[in-house]
Amino acid sequence: MSKIIGIDLGTTNSAVAVLEGTESKIIPNPEGNRTTPSVVAFKNGEIIVGDAAKRQAVTNPETIISIKSKMGTSEKVSANGKEYTPQEISAMILQNLKATAEAYLGEKVEKAVITVPAYFNDAQRQATKDAGKIAGLEVERIVNEPTAAALAYGLDKTDKDEKILVFDLGGGTFDVSILELGDGVFDVLATAGNNKLGGDDFDQKIIDWMVAEFKKENGIDLAQDKMALQRLKDAAEKAKKDLSGVTTTQISLPFITAGAAGPLHLEMALTRAKFDELTHDLVEATRQPVRQALSDAGLSTSDIDEVLLVGGSTRIPAVVELVRHETNKEPNKSVNPDEVVAMGAAIQGGVITGDVKDVVLLDVTPLSLGIETMGGVFTKLIDRNTTIPTSKSQVFSTAADNQPAVDIHVLQGERPMAADNKTLGRFQLTDIPAAPRGIPQIEVTFDIDKNGIVSVKAKDLGTQKEQTIVIKSNSGLSDEEIDKMMKDAEANADADAKRKEEVDTRNEADALVFQTEKTLKDLEGKVEEAEVKKAEEAKEELKKALEGEDIDDIKAKSEALSEIAQNLAVKLYEQANAAQGEAGQATDAQEAPKDDNTFDGDFEESK
């Protein structure tokens, strides 16, 4: 069975891992980095992903960041003269990670396990699965990020019984999960979180502070300047990271803007104390989900054996201190918070292929599921933290006499009234025979698969007529839309490969021209004029081809010059050897006996 890669598709950074033997290994990207920025940019029709996209973000307005925060919504982003869904942009990141894995493994990769925040709802999970499909990946499993982290941590500890609290604060989402490990079973007891809280929010607090301070000093609002704002974002992210290791950091942005008197520079010192003050409400927002998860699991802090920190934002000292205070435990530092999720996803891939034995993953649904009933009430069929996959049925009836149809309004959330919860979808069961209210028996069944994706069935028990839907939110893509996006993505991949080949061909041709010029200089006056002229002509033809767009012509001219250059190089080598030989003979001729009175003989030491 082919390899199943593990992908952590993050808000700010993503990572890809693969199982090698029994060990999960992070695959570095072509730049040698173990994580790849979740950044996509468009420039001159070209799609740029990762480190290269992040580097040019300041000067390129067509740069898209933190697309994960839009997954599961109908919001689109405009770039490159068209509109893209969050799934399409995410697919570009996934394609990049897929290519990284293929280059490392030396084989085609078609299957993946992709992680999502534990608190992702059905629409967000479906969008993630669609993104994988667009990228040319069969998504074997969607795994919750904290669960994947626990899997990576506990794989070599399957003989121990432990209860683990995973505190996962990433770039854009926050989750807390509590798991029980024992005999190879990873059982999620409870999960809680906030899909709108992460490292980006901490960055924004610093940006807002810098903008306010600069406006106070100079009367200019940097928030209105897109290029300045991108520089502020980069500086804020760096300052946040710096303050995890030092108590003061200097923010220096020369020529940030211009005033009436000329260019203006931004110079500010940010202390950790000030940073803690600015972000106090964000840190506090993580406290309640920790308590909620413990309460839902029916545990106290004394029952927790280990606390794992996941996500780059857990390096913030105030966050670590809050975790310490809430759990009465020193967080476990044995896992890399940026890499552990992808590693866990790769392990789950190994479980699916059978390479990892005796490991069972029991995940849960993060939010309650149900339908709207009379009076706008939310009636739950499946409670939050129910182990998945699962199925639950309940019988309802009509609310009016001779009602011919029922509308099924499917919801996800915890609030008592339907209007306050997340709508997953609506469908209708029709042709109900005329009868007084309360007589027809309508059975509603919820199914949640191992990926946390919901399907709902309504059945008239009297007529046995039924209607089933796999939930698609407003952002859900049809199979036709996904197929079209897949074709577009494949075309982009082919175009990218062609573009890379063109660049490589041009670079090799440039290098050949340079090397030929150097060789001709070294051979000046040492070879026949006809050979030099032949090389010069071939070199000029290649230079002329490089000015055009015909790649096949560049290849042909390169091959012609390469052959001539090789012959010249052989001549240069032969001449160098001949010169060395002559020099050696001259040295031998110059050497003479130093003492004609020397003689051979035996001697005996006298004692």
From Swiss-Prot:
Region (Disordered): 578-607
One GO process term, biological-process aspect: aggregation of unicellular organisms
Residues modified to Phosphothreonine: 173
Biased composition (Acidic residues): 598-607
Gene Ontology molecular function: any one: ATP binding
InterPro entries from the UniProt entry: ATPase_NBD (IPR043129), Chaperone_DnaK (IPR012725), Heat_shock_70_CS (IPR018181), HSP70_C_sf (IPR029048), HSP70_peptide-bd_sf (IPR029047), Hsp_70_fam (IPR013126)
Superkingdom per UniProt: Bacteria
Record keywords: ATP-binding, Chaperone, Nucleotide-binding, Phosphoprotein, Stress response
Induction: By stress conditions e.g. heat shock.
SUPFAM superfamilies named among the record's database cross-references: Actin-like ATPase domain, Heat shock protein 70kD (HSP70), C-terminal subdomain, Heat shock protein 70kD (HSP70), peptide-binding domain
GO CC aspect terms: cell surface
Family in the record: Belongs to the heat shock protein 70 family.
Function statement: Acts as a chaperone.
Record-linked HAMAP family: DnaK
Protein name from the UniProt record: Chaperone protein DnaK
